[in-house]
Amino acid sequence: MSTSKRKRADEVQWNKRSTKKKASAPPVKKTGGKADRPSLQIQTLLHSGDTMITVPSGGGCDLISTYARGSDEGNRHTSETLTYKVGVDYHFVADAGACRYSNRGTGVMWLVYDTTPGGNSPSTKDIFAYPDALVAWPTTWKVSRELCHRFVVKRRWLFTMETDGRIGSDIPPTNQSWPPCKRNIDFHKFTSGLGVRTQWKNVTDGGVGAIQRGALYMVIAPGNGVTFTAHGQTRLYFKSVGNQ
């Protein structure tokens, strides 16, 4: 005679429920990720019309980390800033003096970090200390050995411009056609990973005289005497860090 007993229906249902896995708790969301970080601030420097950049022989140097103290997005909110990214979007146009000749030149744009600015923006010769014989050849310029501890080239870009002895408003004869040349060009660059730290004095303006340490300049020089004007904008992506 069999000694096994038939299980009751309610007992079978109980065993099925007890063997089911317990629902796991939802994962705890970690803080401090990218989504929790404050977004970068943006400052845009517009150069058009009266504020266009004139690039003479020997080039020019302009401060671009011009963060005045304030509450807007483009202002610094603390005594220290970190510039991470820079975008430059410009249209270069050879000036009338350069267009009188048939010529070609390779120009250079640099982003230069100045560890200890002295209250005034330096000239290109202050940074590179080139001899006068090389003023028209910026591709040969290097930061002087004596000042390599102060000036650091963060980025360097080349561009080529051409002239053919004519200006843009000249009209060819009906039986001729003139080939195009690069008397006006578009120049677009975007760079990240700069990590430029700027410490500010206890003042509200954003000029070079307000910087205690760490200025960022945009330096442009024409090649072979093809001087020009620059129309466009520079956009800087930065954060306000440090103490209020």
Curated annotation (Swiss-Prot):
GO BP annotations of the record are: symbiont entry into host cell; viral penetration into host nucleus
Where is the motif Bipartite nuclear localization signal annotated in this sequence?
Answer: 1-24
Q: GO CC annotation: what is one?
A: host cell
Principal localization reads virion
The UniProt record lists the keyword DNA-binding: yes
Which cellular compartments is it found in?
Virion; Host nucleus
According to the record, the residues making up region (Disordered) are 1-38
Q: Name one GO molecular function term.
A: structural molecule activity
Q: Which InterPro entries match?
A: Gemcoat_MSV (IPR000143), GV_A/BR1_coat (IPR000263), Viral_coat (IPR029053)
- Keyword NADP attributed: no
Which keywords has UniProt assigned to this entry? Capsid protein, DNA-binding, Host nucleus, T=1 icosahedral capsid protein, Viral penetration into host nucleus, Virion, Virus entry into host cell
Which family does the similarity line name? Answer: Belongs to the geminiviridae capsid protein family.
| Function comment | Encapsidates the viral genome into characteristic twinned ('geminate') particles. Binds the genomic viral ssDNA and shuttles it into and out of the cell nucleus. Plays a role in protection of the genome from degradation, virus acquisition and transmission by insect vectors, infectivity, and systemic movement. The CP of monopartite geminiviruses is absolutely essential for virus movement.
Q: What binding partners and quaternary form does the record give?
A: Homomultimer. Interacts with the movement protein. Binds to single-stranded and double-stranded viral DNA.
Q: What is this protein called?
A: Capsid protein
Q: Which organism is it from?
A: Maize streak virus genotype E (isolate Pat)
Q: What lineage does the source organism belong to?
A: Viruses, Monodnaviria, Shotokuvirae, Cressdnaviricota, Repensiviricetes
